[in-house]
Amino acid sequence: LNLVTKLEELMVVGYPFEVPAEYSSLPQLLGRATVAIETNKGDLQVVVDGYSAPVNAGNFVDLVKRGFYDGLDFNRAEDFYILQAGDPPGEANGFIDPKTNKYRAIPMEVLVKGDDLPVYGETLEELGRYLDQPVIPFNSYGAIALARPGDDPNGGSSQFFFFKFDTEVTPPGYNLMDGRYSVFGYLTEGKEVLEELTAGDKIISAKVIEGIENLKEPE
């Protein structure tokens, strides 16, 4: 996957679209970045894809840069196929921006194959696009997506989850997950570590090791 990522980056000239102005107050990743995550059971490496989900990817890279995830537990493991982290201590369920003292809410964002720019604010199901396929689907092991309240596609913040491939839930072509969550990256190293991680395990540290120059800070 790393080699494929490098080749794809060489093929991209400039950034292919403009993120809607209404999201200018949020970090954006205008390209790709690589994040190394050290856990108590070993190391993971992920590629964060701002070409497919610049706002969700930018939010994640910004929080990694801040050290937000360092020391946080994996707080949820469901049916052996979801592993979630990013819930901070205290009452807040996400990131409270110190500049505004408000919860940073991140929009639903998914780029569909054949579209020029992502869909924002609604799930593909809500839009009636049931069979459309996202550029980054859930049917590859270790896809990373933004966790969110079940009734609010725009209510996610800092919590994210790894999706451990499950053929019953994510068959090729159409599945129950694609288009319902914002996928912003994928695992490139550490599959055997991800398989062992569960609720109660810990992120020791997360660091951006490549692509930080692609992070655009909020205006």
PLM features: what roles do these ranges have?
Residues 1-219:
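Cross-family detector of peptidyl-prolyl cis-trans isomerase
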